[in-house]
Amino acid sequence: YAHQMTALEKSWNKESYAYFMEMGTGKTKVLIDNLAMLYDRGKVNGALIVAPKGVVGTWYTNELPTHLPSHIENVTVLWQANITKKQQDSLDTLFEEGEGLHIIIMNVEALSTDKGMNFANKFLSCHRTMMAIDESTTIKNPQASRTRNILTLARDAKYRRIMTGSPVTKNPLDLFSQCYFLDPFHLNHESYYSFRMRYAIMKT
């Protein structure tokens, strides 16, 4: 569709980009196409997809198998909280040398845990990675441990993307952490509190 092509043309080579597209407009396909373009041009060889619990499995069973071009060899693993030997073997394949795109899909809650953070850090240190947050309002609370952890991880991601149809759920301050994930300089404020002091009138 034309709107998807427009979004892809504007975003594909940017280090950071927000897909603020309404539900049903195909933003997931745009992101996967963007990932494929960066891989084909040698810009990335890894992807860390962070999604809410309700849709994280869909990325693994439907979105990536449907939209990732068939010519791209890939190793795709869905993170599990309880790591069995089989799961560990799958995770280990993400670090094997060779060609191909390495993709890990993680529930956003996993990045509240030491186990999830340690793995994500290792993955980012070993790959040129696109890190994408599906339903990015899941990181709107700057005090939440998962938000702080994800903002830390973002520093090591070569490309960063966020996606949501509703970037503001309660008030405009919801935007701070989402934009900070993309690039701290987008808002000209490196602190949530200085951002709030500049733009918000707090009521008691």
Language-model regions: role of each:
Residues 55-103:
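Conserved nucleic-acid-binding Ia/Ib motif block in the N-terminal RecA-like helicase ATPase lobe
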Residues 84-103, 108-127, 141:
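Conserved helix/coil segment N-terminal to the catalytic DExD/H
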Residues 46, 66-67, 72-77, 81, ...:
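Conserved P-loop NTPase motor "coupling/switch" region that bridges the ATPase
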Residues 19, 49, 163:
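Hydrophobic anchor at the beta1->P-loop junction of P-loop NTPases
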Residues 1-21:
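Conserved pre-motif I regulatory segment
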Residues 14-34:
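Walker A/P-loop
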Residues 28-30, 43-66, 169-174:
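Conserved Walker A/P-loop ATP-binding site and its immediately adjacent core
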Residues 134-136:
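Walker B catalytic acidic pair
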